Amino acid sequence: MANLSYKGFTIGVEEEYMVIDPVTRELKSHEQKIVHEGQKLIKDKVKAEMHQAVVEVGTDICQDIDEAFMDVSTLRKTISGIGESLGLKLGASGTHPFSHWESQLITDHVRYSEIVNELQEAARSNLIFGLHVHVGMENREMAIHIANSARYFLPHVYALSTNSPFWEGRTTGYKSFRTKVFDKFPRTGIPDYFESIEAYENYVKLLVKTNCIDNAKKIWWDLRVHPFFNTVEFRICDIPMTVQETIAIAALFQALCAKLYKLRSQNLNFMTYSRALINENKWRASRYGIDGSMIDFGKETEVNTRVLIYELLDFIDDVVPQLGSRHAVNYVHNMLEQGTGADRQLKVYEQTNSLVDVVDYIHGNFLTGI
């Protein structure tokens, strides 16, 4: 076991940013000006999203967490600079504090037209901003095994990412309202357990055959085996406010995959739980963030969420040194101390009673730590 290598657990990070009008602080439909200018500098690492007020960026395949940090930092600086040159601001929050989706324009693209035509108001109202983390796998069989076990930990990491307490000018009472918005889509949420990659692929084939989807990219679960790459894609998290938070979360997902791989290599398996049970913890994470409690299914008892996150850190600790991600994983302690993005947004609002000030705070932290 001493020779076990984790070099195959590469990292890819996708972030979705909000485009902000510097005067009104509303979301700004910008006709893809940032995307067009960005593609001159970073090519296909910047993409349009369904709403014009959203810009999506994606890193290269990163060999370790330091490379991912540099790539995400460069992307944030580049997009921020382009936005500034166009008289626009950027920010990272799972929802905009007060802009209404009805005022935002849909990007003119055949894929988005198809989605809107099928999903109607569910698609038009899906004005949200997420973080996706890809972790490389040696093969798809290993990917489905790791995905099955990793489902249990999704609410733990999601709680750390919560960064969407407001929706259309209202305090929602949730630390992450983003997933409540996204739940209107089909094929979302915690995935089922699949016995094998063949079982998963048969499921996909059935959906394609019966005209539910045209390809597996329209399976929008919180965690999925990517349809085209040998990766496990973690999709549950709100976009974090800062790059350090994004990288800490990416490091957690990478280490979790490595730990589950290590157990598999020792002919050990982590207990798998039903979607129904995991959904209970997901709801708690959405509502309370890191300040609530979750269910420890093994002990059949409630446990403080922070305690469970510390237990997750202990669980992955033995693989962190070989991954070279100690500093990134350790930043989770800062996140637990300073509160999540949602906690900080709510604190600003409590102090100022101004959602405009909340937007300014979000924008002001876009390049923090870079």
List each language-model region with its residue ranges.
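Acidic, His- and aromatic-enriched active-site or binding-groove loops in soluble protein domains
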Residues: 109-130
